[in-house]
Amino acid sequence: GYDCTIYNLDFPDVIDMRHRWVPKADNEIDLPYSATDHEWLTKVSGGKGVIAVAPGVFYYLPIPEVAALVDAFGQAFPGGRLVYETESPMVMRGSEKQIARHGTPASMPFKVKDPYKPQDWSDAVRDYHVTFNFLDYLTDEQRKQIPSQYRILFGFFERIRGIYVVNMGF
């Protein structure tokens, strides 16, 4: 058996497309909702704890909607964690231009000037960490396997605080 349940939160058509390529495991539950439709929070069992990972999700949402989600998540899952990565406004503007150049323009309204501001979005936030270097998650041996141009790029983004991971506990 499995020690955890994985909830796939996404739009119904995206969930269907995912299942064409990746079979659903026995411990997975699909939640066909938008992240901003807080009804999905009532479908998640928090009995064993909840860790929500939102890679690449918040870029496309307005700040007030993410702030409301952070607060609702914190209220629904005391002791839970929410982890996401994002970019500084300057880097995100560059990302928008890059995406538009390749034919898929998309607005990225989640431009938070202060990476520490989201900890104020909910009274339920108990701890809050920001990591500005994605290589911090790797051992020295693993870092050596990353091509040098990428290590340099990650170092640059760390210096300008251009991309970062937020890890908040409730």
Protein language model regions, located:
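Alpha-helical subdomain
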Residues: G1-F170
